[in-house]
């Protein structure tokens, strides 16, 4: 919990620094951070090295600089990562990157979500549905399309912490509950 708050603060600081220049600069930061994240995900040894307290700050900074030069990271990203090493916040790097991406998505008015249907939709139907939902929400949506035959028909849309359930299964359950209530209200 505390780690999340700290990660959000570091992400906000980096985001604000980039935004002083332009949104394009923030996107460049995001590209570099994505490359760092990919390196961390593909190398358990690197992750261990950056997290392990047995290695000195200077050793970690040296390795970070070499990696950042390999991906041609901008100087502010280099400075940021060196600061994280100095403050011993490298174990929070993945959380910081995720928080940064959320800030960038908010700035670009992008919302991530999940759309569940009973059957597989072809690309044309997915595109039409996405355009329709974007018009209704006035936001750009990036949806993960999934199939769940248990919903019987219709859609279930998860956006952030909200769920919009327009599935046939839920509608049938509502009708069933209404009928049950009607039966219990008129029972002798």
UniProtKB/Swiss-Prot annotation:
Primary location: membrane
GO CC annotation, single: proton-transporting ATP synthase complex
KW Nucleotide-binding (keyword) present: no
Keywords, alphabetical: ATP synthesis, Cell membrane, CF(1), Hydrogen ion transport, Ion transport, Membrane, Transport
Protein's cellular compartments: Cell membrane
Residues in the signal sequence: none
Membrane protein topology class: Peripheral membrane protein
Pfam families in the record: OSCP
Superkingdom as given in the UniProt entry: Bacteria
InterPro entries membership: ATP_synth_OSCP/delta_N_sf, ATPase_OSCP/d_CS, ATPase_OSCP/dsu
Keyword Membrane: yes
Molecular function as annotated in GO: proton-transporting ATP synthase activity, rotational mechanism
Subunit composition and interactions: F-type ATPases have 2 components, F(1) - the catalytic core - and F(0) - the membrane proton channel. F(1) has five subunits: alpha(3), beta(3), gamma(1), delta(1), epsilon(1). F(0) has three main subunits: a(1), b(2) and c(10-14). The alpha and beta chains form an alternating ring which encloses part of the gamma chain. F(1) is attached to F(0) by a central stalk formed by the gamma and epsilon chains, while a peripheral stalk is formed by the delta and b chains.
Annotated family: Belongs to the ATPase delta chain family.
Function: F(1)F(0) ATP synthase produces ATP from ADP in the presence of a proton or sodium gradient. F-type ATPases consist of two structural domains, F(1) containing the extramembraneous catalytic core and F(0) containing the membrane proton channel, linked together by a central stalk and a peripheral stalk. During catalysis, ATP synthesis in the catalytic domain of F(1) is coupled via a rotary mechanism of the central stalk subunits to proton translocation. This protein is part of the stalk that links CF(0) to CF(1). It either transmits conformational changes from CF(0) to CF(1) or is implicated in proton conduction.
UniProt-recorded name of the protein: ATP synthase subunit delta
Gene of this entry: atpH
């Amino acid at each position: 919990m505390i780690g999340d708050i700290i990660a959000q603060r570091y992400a906000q600081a980096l985001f604000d620094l980039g935004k002083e220049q332009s949104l394009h600069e923030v996107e460049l930061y995001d590209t570099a951070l994505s490359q760092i994240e990919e390196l961390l995900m593909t190398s358990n040894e690197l992750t261990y090295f950056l997290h392990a307290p047995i290695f000195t700050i200077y050793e970690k900074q040296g390795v970070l600089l070499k990696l950042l030069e390999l991906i041609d990271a901008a100087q502010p990203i280099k400075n940021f990562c060196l600061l994280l090493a100095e403050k011993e916040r490298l174990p929070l790097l993945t959380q910081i990157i995720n928080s940064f991406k959320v800030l960038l998505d908010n700035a670009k008015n992008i919302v991530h979500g999940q759309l569940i249907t009973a059957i597989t939709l072809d690309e044309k139907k997915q595109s039409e549905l996405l355009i329709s939902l974007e018009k209704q929400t006035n936001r750009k949506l990036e949806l993960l399309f999934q199939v769940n035959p248990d919903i019987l028909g219709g859609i279930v849309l998860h956006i952030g912490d909200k769920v919009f359930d327009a599935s046939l299964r839920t509608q049938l359950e509502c009708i069933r509950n209404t009928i049950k209530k009607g039966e219990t209200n008129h029972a002798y």
